[in-house]
């Protein structure tokens, strides 16, 4: 283990900094998951006596469910350290399970290690609000569901979007989910391809329905007030948004997902 702790050649993947960053934000109800077994000794050296769980090696989908479902039921937030995915989880079953069953808030890279953060919250399986919003000619948003209506600064806003491919989708698109203040200024956002990049739009088949979950991290200094949540789509590698039509009428380049109330922290 000497090399892991003291040889600069091993410092590219800075587990000390990862552990420090997690410790700075950890709160009761958080846990850390390691997706590669050889992460255990070096990470727990810097992060001892905490809730840390090694993921099963080469899991199948049932094994991923057996491992993750109890953790998602016990903890509110999960930190995932992804390293050597091609060897430890080549089919990405851990990441796929979490895309279906949690709300990812973002990634951060430390050398070759990727730290991802997920919020565990109720999982709507059908829209709470139905929509008939068409993005371009090939994609329809059938509706959305929010978990909760009032949030405090620092909370995660869980959003589920329900997409449908009307026909073959020729290109890859990203989704942006944005929280706007009363002046229309951006307050928080999450941008990624559907399913956290696992369900690329150019793989959708006509009639396919995609349940797509997003965790929007609210800034710690977000002022209290009412905010509007919106969703849009844009081409990967570009910035121009797809046009939106609702009830056969042009509706700009985004769709409103309703309002969210931010209240002072207790």
Which residues make up each language-model segment?
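Transmembrane alpha-helical segments
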Residues: 1-10
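C-terminal luminal/periplasmic domains and tails of membrane-associated envelope-modifying transferases
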Residues: 12, 16-41, 45-266
